[in-house]
Amino acid sequence: MRATLKNAWKKAEQKTPLHDEEAGYARPFEYVVGWKSDSIQLGDHPGTQRGIGSDYRGTINLVDYPDARRMDLRQTIRDPFEQVQVRQFNQDSTTPIYAVCDLSGSMQFRGRQRKLDTAVEIATAVANSAYNMGDLFGFIGYNQQVLEDFTLPLSRNYHQSKQTIALLHEYHSLRIGMEGVTDMPNFLGQTRALVFWISDFHMPLQVIEKTLLAMSAHKVVPIVLWDDEEYKKLPKFGFGTMIDLETGRNRTLFFRSEVKAKFIHAFHARRQSLEALFMRFESPALFMHGDYRPELMTHYFEQAM
């Protein structure tokens, strides 16, 4: 049984070939922004800037907004000062989109697939979706610190984003923590953005809460990557070695049904704690136990936004 639990450690150390082409085919999903963007750039989301759009904002004097094509006859007739009134609309604008990725040691866990490879696919799908919507996309990777080599400012450079994210298929750093997460919010812009936070969230709840507070100006979508082999597929009977991928520490346990049940219960309790914490910040979590599926992401926005 000892070898069974060590497989995740051994698999995490194996090199994975670069999957640039596979990452590029990460299917996009549909997302919804629940606020009005103040961007001056034309996009697909409701905005606050005056311009071409379908969001009616009222009427104004023709002298102040000389566009006779938008003349409002009814309001013009009703105007006590006999001024010609024209309709005003808010233009559809862009919204900043970020994918924030946990690159700590625990993301090297491999069940059927390495967690980090799943995160790469999700981050690429976020980039694809932002590109389809005409939005700006940025990427931030962190472990013990925010990694500049895996941090991209907001841009429409789709190919650079895809190529940089794909490099993470060859990222295999073990025994490394996640302390940089508390500095990560400093790399987000000041404009309200949609932030996809991709992690297994195997970190203290106090750290998560502190980070959410620092990102309170943004809309955060926590994507929780858990693998059934972490807790559901433990041995029912026999010796096993549990290894912490972030510290390298290991502990040998004698497994029996009661011990396995405690692990499962602990994960369920952890999930409830995470869900409660995220809901306090109006950021319901999306738990992913298997492969990335775009319909799950789309459904999330249909239910949560």
Language-model features, listed with the residues they occupy:
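Exposed, interaction-prone extracellular/peripheral surfaces
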Residues: 2-42, 60-66, 75-77, 86-88, ...
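Charged, amphipathic alpha-helical linkers/stalks
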Residues: 54-55
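Short, Gly/Ser/Thr-enriched beta-strand-loop segments that form substrate-interacting elements
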Residues: 72
